[in-house]
Structures are given as C-alpha cells and as structure tokens.
C-alpha cells in the first residue's frame, strides 16, 4: 500500500469525483477525512466504505468558502489524526446561466467556493505541512476552465 499511514483530507468527498478520490486514497492505505457541505448521510456512507477497507475515517461538515470554517476543519484533522499529509481540494459548485441573467450572488458563490475555498484550505493545511516538512496538495479543476459554457 503506497499511502500506508498517511492522513488525507478530501473536500467535497460525499459524492462524485471527491467520493472516488477518497475511496482510492483509502484503497492505497490512507486514513481519510470526508468533507461535505450538504449531505451528512452521503458523507457517512463514504466514511463507512473507507472503514470497511480497514482504514480510519471521519466526516467534517465545513463551508470552505469561510476561512474560519476551513481552518477549523484542518485543525480538526490534525487534532484527530496528529497530522495532515494530503489535501485534495475537490469541492466546487456551478451556477450556470447566461451572463445577462446571472445573479451577482451566484457569481460570488462560485468564486468564493471554487477559488477562495482552495485558498482557505491550502493556507490552513500548509502551516502544518511546513512544520512536518512534508505534505502533498492536489487541486482539482473543472473542464469548464478549458472549455466554457454558453453564457
């Protein structure tokens, strides 16, 4: 197992790509923190699948667009696991719509989650990783970064 003993945090891990990443990390030996914004039940299902592989897992609800929430989440990871070795910035939202019809609140929500959320989580994790002199950060982006939607 390539990641035996490593402690990972995956944002947006209750479904989709985040869920698949969390399960893949666990399959390689990592203990995983499953972050979610909405469905605690879905997050707990992912954690149960991880535990069924013989790995440790727990769930943390956090709105990563909030610096305080992101920092508290990473602090919880370190408190529970003693360290953070891997951060996967996966959480993201879409508010697709034509520019002329898009509400400013929708634009702001996308930027604060998809951009500021990555900043918040990375900043919170990197202070521990620097003290450990080790750590990996992976930030996932959407294909929309290459090919935009109509709008």
Regions flagged by a language model, labelled:
Residues 7, 14-16:
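Conserved glycine-rich cofactor-binding loop
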Residues 28-45:
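Conserved glycine-rich Rossmann-like NAD(P)H-binding loop of the short-chain dehydrogenase/reductase
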Residues 40-41, 61-73, 104:
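The beta1-alpha1 cofactor-binding region of Rossmann-like NAD(H)/NADP(H)-dependent oxidoreductases
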Residues 53-56, 76-87, 95, 106, ...:
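A glycine-rich helix->loop->beta "capping" turn
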Residues 98-99, 106-111:
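Substrate-binding pocket helix/loop in short-chain dehydrogenase/reductase
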Residues 122-123:
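A short, exposed helix-loop element centered on a Lys and neighboring polar residues
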Residues 142:
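Residue(s) in the substrate-gating loop at a strand-loop-helix junction
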């Amino acid at each position: 197992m390539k990641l035996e003993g490593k402690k990972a945090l995956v944002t947006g891990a209750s479904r989709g790509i985040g869920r698949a990443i969390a399960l893949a990390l666990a399959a390689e030996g990592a203990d995983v923190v499953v972050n979610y914004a909405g469905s605690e039940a879905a997050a707990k299902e992912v954690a149960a699948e991880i535990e069924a592989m013989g790995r440790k897992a727990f769930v943390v609800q956090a709105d990563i667009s909030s610096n305080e929430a992101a920092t508290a989440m990473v602090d919880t990871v370190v408190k529970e696991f003693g360290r953070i070795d891997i951060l996967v910035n996966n959480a993201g939202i879409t508010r697709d719509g034509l520019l002329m019809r898009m509400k400013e609140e929708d634009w702001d929500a996308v930027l604060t989650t998809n951009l500021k959320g990555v900043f918040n989580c990375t900043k919170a994790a990197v202070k521990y990783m620097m003290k450990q002199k080790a750590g990996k950060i992976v930030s996932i982006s959407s294909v929309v970064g290459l090919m935009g939607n109509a709008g």
